[in-house]
């Protein structure tokens, strides 16, 4: 299996086991859900009426005042009262076996290859850290929305792209299913292709 680099027009051999893998939609969905759940902090928390400080004494007599009956000043109906269905800290993390995660990444990369959304460049380097020059480089390649995968991310490439919503840049070790699916195109350097093959073998 071969792919043509978009800059030098040279042919690059690809490993069929990684770049022509059968697409498994269920596994990809599981990997995406697991990744997104593992990114959740789960720190949202409120206090119920029993946890809020104070409210032990009945504010006024049950009868005789003409006011509505009340048993505590920490009722959810009151200002400074507890929350009726208070959320609690929760661990959302899920486990996904390494083999399953690798197969999911193979499925996504292979599907990108089949649909023509995986593009290979011989090398990707920026002369400086200016966002303007980074955009100019991407416009020359006619790519308006992409994830760029490099073997190692240089400082110029990182600084030039970090303020742009339509582009993201990462190295091979930090590839994740959500980023691969989020962008229209995935641009990979030749050096990164070799590392991907080693990593997903």
From Swiss-Prot:
For whether the record's keyword set contains Iron, the answer is no
Q: Which GO terms describe its molecular function?
A: rRNA binding; structural constituent of ribosome
Keywords on this record? Ribonucleoprotein, Ribosomal protein, RNA-binding, rRNA-binding
Pfam families recorded for this chain?
Ribosomal_L4
Name one cellular component (GO) term: ribonucleoprotein complex
Coiled coil spans:
none
Concerning Gene3D superfamilies, the annotation shows:
3.40.1370.10
- Specify the superkingdom: Bacteria
Does the UniProt entry include the keyword Ribonucleoprotein? yes
Q: How does this chain assemble?
A: Part of the 50S ribosomal subunit.
Name of this protein = Large ribosomal subunit protein uL4
Its lineage reads: Bacteria, Pseudomonadati, Pseudomonadota, Gammaproteobacteria, Legionellales
